[in-house]
Amino acid sequence: MQTWQQRVDKALGHYLPDEKTTPVELHQAMRYSVLDGGKRVRPFLVYAAGEAMQADATALDVTACAVELIHAYSLIHDDLPAMDDDDLRRGKPTCHRAFSEATAILAGDALQALTFHLLAYHLPDSIPAEQRLSMLDMLAVASGSRGMAGGQAIDLASVGQQLSLAELENMHIHKTGALIRASVKMGAMCRPGVDADLLQKLDHYAKCIGLAFQIQDDILDEIADTETLGKTQGADRALNKPTYPALLGLEDAKEMAMELYTDAIQSLTDFDQRADPLRWLAQYIVERGN
């Protein structure tokens, strides 16, 4: 994991615009929001899925950067006053607090654009063109109205509402789960001619851990402190957002996360020890903060 952290951080530093180039403040905001912070869970999932499939190393670096840039863009916009209005992210002032609201909006836009530039021009030719196009489409869908953006829209519309479990799951399958599923599948697709059956099993794994990730996030928002979280503790409760602990109770939410973890692990039965990083990441997702 440490090697993967070093690889993705080095690649991100390379692909992000130099903060001394014009427009300086925009480039500073982009680098500020991406570098020196974050758990890098999505890039790690790219690398872990690639490891399980013996994928191309260069393609994995590019793809790991792409999913982290999309994630960073989404966090910048989620933190804006018009959305979650948060002051802290990764233990430091949010982008719009460190710079300005206008610069934060532009930084998010620019990170999203850079994502698709990387996938369009920096994936190696060893990956078939059709497969590269499929990866582009996959990330576009995962980040748009049928993915993250759609999930955030549902989230904003659900403030103060009582959602059913099915409605809450649907929201987070889009808001959180879509990018996690794309990260795993795109990592696997960094192998030329990826096996469709194995890809389907990885997608099921990713769907399970995507929901488990959000449940654990909701749990930590209730029980962890601001310093541990790196963002404002209790923010979801303060905004009267629907969460798994609020709907199910804390203990039942923990049990649901563990059931999803077990389901995720079972979906990896046909994979050998090269899938152990995926198994470890699933465990990390449900145990982090404990």
Say what each PLM segment does.
Residues M1:
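Double-stranded RNA-binding/processing signature
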Residues W4-R7, L16, K20-S267, D276-V286:
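Mg2+-dependent prenyl diphosphate-binding active-site environment of isoprenoid biosynthetic enzymes
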Residues Q273, E287-N290:
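Generic C-terminal helix-cap and adjacent flexible tail
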